[in-house]
Amino acid sequence: MLKGKVAVVTGGTRGIGFQIVRKYLANGAKVVLFGSRQESVDKALKQLKEENADWEVEGKFPKLTDAAEVEKAIMEVKDKFGKIDILVNNAGISQSTPLYDYTPEEFDKVIDLNVKGIFYAILPTAKIMKEQGGGCIINTSSMVSISGQPAGVGYPTSKFAVNGLTISLARELGKDHIRVNAVAPGVTKTDMVAALPEQVVQRISAGIPIGRPGEPEEVADAFLYLASDMASYVTGEILSVDGASKA
């Protein structure tokens, strides 16, 4: 499905991001995964190479809240492979702090990574994609971008922003043959969800009509579809993968 494609996946060392990397590699893509630390990048690369030594995968660890570092890393990928066909903006953080305990610093932290970090990756990549005649950008949103959540207001705020960024750029970049979509997972078995208070997870899980949280592999399938030619006329979409949680 992705033979010959070059993909960059941020937040690609664990959880949904790691499964996206696996799906892309298994379907013929060359992948550069971005992680937050060298240790996590090295661990992910080791796991992937042990699974299939023939997979073409590399790793980088730019600070995603630093526009210059992100641009440098993106340009290094382009210089090595000659192009970037797919950009997946999956890196992000969650919060569950009640408003009355919230600090401006906490709010800034989640906005800086979840919103600005995506913009910093898109800006140089979109220019590359325009020059090469097109490409595909997929952002990770969330179910709470539609439903909201009762604590940690910075997180749903950031994901509402991701949706707006996705839809607006789909309209702006369509003429350059760049598709821009987002995937909005529901409760999924990731480290981020595991870090939430148990009562928060239980409350959210109770509203899943399908009766269980999602698996990272199931969410990654949506990213595979959107990156493939099967989605060649799909752009500006926020694809929910949430077991009908928002239905």
Per-region residue spans from a language model:
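Short C-terminal tail/terminal secondary-structure segment
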Residues: 147, 224, 235-247
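Residue(s) in the substrate-gating loop at a strand-loop-helix junction
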Residues: 142
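Active-site helix of classical SDR
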Residues: 122, 158
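Substrate-binding pocket helix/loop in short-chain dehydrogenase/reductase
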Residues: 98-99, 106-111, 193, 204
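Conserved glycine-rich Rossmann-like NAD(P)H-binding loop of the short-chain dehydrogenase/reductase
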Residues: 27-43
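Conserved glycine-rich cofactor-binding loop
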Residues: 13-15
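Alpha-helical segment proximal to the catalytic Tyr-Lys
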Residues: 127, 171-175, 232
